[in-house]
């Protein structure tokens, strides 16, 4: 059960202990965890066609294509199970890419792609007050992504640098406490990656992403031009995969991810610190009746 109407003088940044309050008339229930009610249904169908053409003895490769998508979204009320909103939209979107080989080991590339994507879902509350359209999805939108980059193959070690830009509609809660689409979030950045085999049986992939994510056309001086909440300015990653010499088919892997600090509200008055995560795992390949089976474990 969730209740957004009872307000207590506390916060995550300055917690104060309180006794359990009574449920208000606006409390909503997700029902039993063993038999939960349906609250959202999403159906996506997609069909894509494309072709790559070579020119100048394949020094220049051009790929063009299109993708037809049908996206159906239906939302249901928590307490009653009745349908609260639905969308059924279709679109045919273009995609294109170009690769130009300056040398056998050096290439320039660029691509552009559009696609139909699900809109954001309205939160249950805002500043302790229930949102009028809680749980409802915004209308599907068209995502657009542009990339341009360079790739260099230094005898098995591949270096790449990519500039990218993406736009998506931005959801916000208006003066009537209703979640609506207003403005857009623009993500622009630079991604640097390197991958190769520094020693026999050891594969490595590492990179850094520098991000400039801004809120645009929000209609408010408090948020326009501010950083998108939850998006750090930088992210580092390193992944290693090693084939062990003592057991054939057994591999060990590890991945480290580090991010910078990020804003936790649209006005950028609150900030959360960066974090580091370590993932480790193992993979074992074995033959089962003539078929290769992969067993994985990860923490």
Describe every region a protein language model picked out.
Residues 1, 55-60, 103-105, 155-156, ...:
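Short loop/turn motifs that connect adjacent beta-strands in outer-membrane beta-barrel proteins
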Residues 1, 51, 62-64, 96, ...:
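Membrane-embedded beta-strand positions of outer-membrane beta-barrel proteins
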Residues 57, 158, 163-167, 181-266:
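Gram-negative outer-membrane beta-barrel transporters
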Residues 52-55, 98-101, 140, 150-152, ...:
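Residue-level signature of outer-membrane beta-barrel architecture
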